[in-house]
Amino acid sequence: LTTITSLIMTYSMPTLPYAKDALAPIISQETIDFHYGKHLQTYVNNLNALVSGTPFEGKTVEEIVAVAPDGAIFNNAGQVLNHTLYFLQFTPQPEQNQPAGKLAEAIQRDFGNFENFKDEMTQAATSLFGSGWAWLAMDKDGKLVIVKEPNGSNPIRQGMKPLLGFDVWEHAYYLDYQNRRTDHLANLWKIIDWKVVENRM
């Protein structure tokens, strides 16, 4: 019985679609080793241990984040989800430097143009006090919005779809940029895989 239960759902690390040094110098291999290899691995390990024997066992990370009460299970599930979306949205050689297709049309509709969106997203991430995330999300009506989430929270908690996330916890950038959060954010725009972001709509 124990073996069967353990097969229901275990949370695992996302496979990076690039080599650990491929995003350098924007995100160094050292940062990937710590941020992905240690921080995210810890959240994954914690979540697997915490949900065992609870009503959340066997639920997807998205399901947990949507309904779990504030506390350790929610915090770790949120960070597993956030970091999975984060690491999978990058590519060392983007085919395009801004969105195309339906994502581009939605940005045009809801922000006026790409530069306005970029400025608003950067401002949200820059101005978030302490640790947290800035997200481009799609609300229940299909409108694109920028959401600031504290700590490990995610727009799923508000019934939205997360499309693009910027991590402003210091562990995301301190090895490469020290206290220069703004420089880090400016560089992230150069490695976004817009096709991945669009496919999340």
For every predicted segment, state its role:
Residues 1-8:
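Short, Lys/Arg-enriched N-terminal segments with co-localized hydrophobic residues
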